[in-house]
Amino acid sequence: MKVRPSVKKMCDACRVIKRNGRTMIICSANPKHKQRAGK
């Protein structure tokens, strides 16, 4: 999982979700695309 100040979709399969007030990207096609915003 990458932790970044700002998260962006890397492909069409990426989905933006919010968990515990944090924005996250999950991807069914490529698990390398998983990201989380913030500290």
From Swiss-Prot:
Ribosomal protein among keywords: yes
GO CC terms: cytoplasm; ribonucleoprotein complex; ribosome
One GO BP annotation of this record: translation
Keywords per UniProt: Ribonucleoprotein, Ribosomal protein
UniProt cross-references to InterPro entries, sorted A to Z: Ribosomal_bL36, Ribosomal_bL36_sp
Ribonucleoprotein in keyword set: yes
SUPFAM superfamilies cross-referenced by the UniProt entry: Ribosomal protein L36
GO terms of molecular function: structural constituent of ribosome
Coiled coil ranges: none
HAMAP family noted in UniProt: Ribosomal_bL36
PANTHER family linked: 50S RIBOSOMAL PROTEIN L36, CHLOROPLASTIC (PTHR42888), LARGE RIBOSOMAL SUBUNIT PROTEIN BL36C (PTHR42888:SF1)
Family: Belongs to the bacterial ribosomal protein bL36 family.
Name under which the protein is recorded: Large ribosomal subunit protein bL36
